Amino acid sequence: MTTASRLPVGPGERVLDLCAAPGGKATALGAKLFGEGLLVANDISASRVKALLKNIEVMGIPNSFLLNEVPAKIAEQFPAYFDKILVDAPCSGEGMFRKNPEAARVWSEEKPPECAKMQKEIVKQAISMLKPGGMMIYSTCTFSPEENEQIIAWVLREFPEMQLIPMKGYEGFSEGRPDLADGNPELKKCVRIWPHHMDGEGHFVALMQKSRTPEMDDVSPEKSSAYISEADEESSDHDDVKKKKKKAKKGRKDQKERNIQFG
């Protein structure tokens, strides 16, 4: 859940989880919306979407809809639409070998480059759906540089409007490795999570922001910075939303009691 906790989402935003099944990250993002805004959860696998649907329903995320589509088709309908996008990309799964021996059994030397090709296409489509000023978080559960630092280095070269954003770290977090890609020092802003450094599996995470345009001057950079520094904490706005909902619920209950008493 590190990926979902690092993406700063607030009520009223449009959020896309592009590779969402089975739904743990999607439901975490939906909870941050507090019933306001929109969550779009997509997965290309029809069988995995069933698990995604179940988890969305169980968690009661009302402002959401599910898709079972390739990213390119979604991008045709949602150009520059989303405030926040999460891409937990399909990968070679090297970080899961300890947890899932089957992942180690099916691994081959050809898998990382094959996955990297697919990841580039997914990321390209995700960037096209991201609003100027919006944020995208990319993650994998593999150690392979081809799928991690080299993907982000490619993004920085091919999409100059994208820039890496540093994330708040925890014990066990390690910096990205520029030496495993093109040497760009910006790659240190990525995060590697090693299973022998903390309790968990191997992961890679990178948070990026799309350059703003003059039309977006009403959204202050300070707001983005505040979100980043407190990505896993509830804001005062969240508390206000909960208080308003609680007050409205109490009002409806009182009205119902009066109707019973005098009706």
Could you tell me what each predicted segment is?
Residues 1-263:
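S-adenosylmethionine
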